Every structure is written in structure tokens, then in C-alpha cells.
Amino acid sequence: MLHQKPDIFCKIELGLPLSKVQDLLAEIDANYGEIIKYKIDTDGQRKRNKPKYVEKLGEFCTRVINPPNDRLKQIQKRINKYLNAKIPLPKYAFGAVKNKDNVKNAREHKGQKYVFQTDIRDFFPSISYKRVYAALTSAGFSPDVASLITRLTTYKGHLPQGAPTSTFLANLVFSTTDRKSVV
């Protein structure tokens, strides 16, 4: 499933795989010493967990946000920009995709007999380190590079809500699932 290499991840077209960590660092304009400091998944990388109150269906619930510290956030923004430039998401992906929004998504479904909509509880925390790593290797990254990206973008073994890279990586992880759902 995740190990399939869909056409959208054509390695030759993307200039992948990046086989060396140094290649990734050059692409995101960082040096190894800087990255190595942020590579290990520790509590020290994150600001204090912030509960965020959101209204959903007339009720208030909380979401725990785990934003990275300022330096890690800069690195993640560079990684996010790099991933967005290298890996095209499927045309049906709308969640936090540039130039797409709920209105455009609704237009795509106008006139359809059935539309399935769901909200996954604890969505980002439900996406594990292993699934992020598998999606990146499936997209053509070498194990070393996929491991580094995964370690820099996950927190306590999952995607954190509040990181610049989480939405793109969630879209990447679920692109195979989404593709199977599209009729």
C-alpha cells in the first residue's frame, strides 16, 4: 500500500532520490551541525504544550498544539518548502494546500450524488513516525534522508499539531488512502 510508488511520485521527474543527508541539507540551506542539534526527538524541542479551544458543532473541545521552538520551526519551514516543490500532491488534496480552500473543494463535489465527509479524532497524533517514514521512502527518498526528515518533523513518535510540515506530510501519508476513496 504505502510501498507502492504512484505515478505522482515519479522519481526521475522529481530529481529523487536524494541519497545523502548532505544533499538535503544543501537543499534546505542548513548545515549538518545545526541539524544534528535538532535531530533527536526530545521535549526540549517544543514550546510548552498549548491547549487550544475550538468550536465544533456548537461544542467547545480542546486540541493540544505542539509547536516547535523557533529554530526548529525555521528548519521545518525550509523542509516544507522543499517537499512542496518536489512532491506534487494529488489534485483532489485540499487540506491546507496552497490556492485551495473549502469553497473550491465544495465546487468540486457539486452535483455529486454522494459526498463522504469525516473528521478524524486526533488526526495528526494518529499519524505515526513509521507512516511518515514509509511515505517518504515511497516518494523516493533514501532511507537516511527519509529518516532525517521524519525525525525533524515528528514529535513523540507522531506528527505534531502546530508544526509547519504536519499538513503536507499528512497529505502525503494519506494520498494512497485518498486515491482509493476517489471514485
Tell me what each language-model feature is:
Residues 1-53:
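Non-catalytic, polymerase-adjacent accessory regions of viral genome-replication enzymes
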Residues 5, 16-19, 30, 67-78, ...:
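Generic alpha-helix structural propensity
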Residues 17, 82-83, 87, 132-135:
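N-terminal low-complexity, intrinsically disordered segments
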Residues 34, 61, 112-116:
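A generic secondary-structure signal marking the coil-to-beta-strand transition
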Residues 37-76, 93-95, 151-171:
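Short, conserved non-catalytic motifs in the polymerase core
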Residues 71-122, 167:
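Active-site-proximal segment of RNA-dependent polymerases
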Residues 108-183:
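Conserved polymerase palm-domain catalytic core
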